[in-house]
Amino acid sequence: MLLAIDVRNTHTVVGLISGSGDHAKVEQHWRIRTEPEVTADELALTIDGLIGDDAERLTGAAGLSTVPSVLHEVRVMLDQYWPSVPHVLIEPGVRTGIPLLVDNPKEVGADRIVNCLAAYHKFGTASIVVDFGSSICVDVVSAKGEFLGGAIAPGVQVSSDAAAERSAALRRVELTRPRSVVGKNTVECMQAGAVFGFAGLVDGLVSRVRDDVDGFGGGDVNVVATGHGAPLVLADLRTVEHYDRHLTLDGLRLVFERNRDSQRGKLKQAR
């Protein structure tokens, strides 16, 4: 059983994956709040409480974090609480198998890398990955499996909250799909702007990639959405063909397997 840990700016997803290769399956997953000041001990208590008896069945662990301080605590946690479980954390120097054709590869978020790796492995074609998190990342992977770059926009919830915070006449609203693009009250107006506005933003970015990037204008390009915020706008997206809620967890598994296999089945054990 592989323990997969996906730490983002606001929330963390913990998953348990059974099997490997084409037989891999996400058996369970949980979403918890990310605390930037969390300690390794606190992480261990939380994760051990979630996975229960499966802690004794772990054969590996893979993790990423967009919060550097938490990545350090994840490493310490694995070293101290699961010292016999081989692990890999996505950071510079780790073999991911996806070339980063950008100005500064060290700037590329680990989440973006594993998403594109998983999409290329899933489809085997040029792909566009749209990850709906605290930011919306539209990332591009070539037909050769190369990360070409992408675009980053503020996330739906972040933008809606910022509008409410900076305007005396607006308030924070629950983000659900409104009955019409033409809102009849302030809440519906904000919901319409968030849902339909960001659907248009994503469709616009995907269409521009198709128009402007060589090799992306044909029908052999797959567009996949992932992330906790994706279901909010999926029905209104005209350019996205696929949705994979576990794309990032699958990418973590692929990186773990690549590093395990490259070392004849043995990753460096936790210290």
From Swiss-Prot:
EC number(s) from the headed UniProt entry: 2.7.1.33
The keyword Nucleotide-binding appears for this protein: yes
Catalytic reaction annotation: (R)-pantothenate + ATP = (R)-4'-phosphopantothenate + ADP + H(+)
Cited PANTHER family: TYPE III PANTOTHENATE KINASE
Pathway membership, UniProt: Cofactor biosynthesis; coenzyme A biosynthesis; CoA from (R)-pantothenate: step 1/5
Keywords: ATP-binding, Coenzyme A biosynthesis, Cytoplasm, Kinase, Metal-binding, Nucleotide-binding, Potassium, Transferase
Database matches in InterPro entries: ATPase_NBD, Type_III_PanK
Chain positions recorded as substrate binding sites: 109-112, 186
Gene3D superfamilies xrefs: 3.30.420.40
CDD domains: ASKHA_NBD_PanK-III
Similarity comment: Belongs to the type III pantothenate kinase family.
Subcellular localization: Cytoplasm
Major localisation: cytoplasm
Species the sequence originates in: Mycolicibacterium vanbaalenii (strain DSM 7251 / JCM 13017 / BCRC 16820 / KCTC 9966 / NRRL B-24157 / PYR-1)
Disulfide bond entries: none
Protein's UniProt name: Type III pantothenate kinase
Quaternary state and interactors: Homodimer.
UniProt record, GO biological process: coenzyme A biosynthetic process
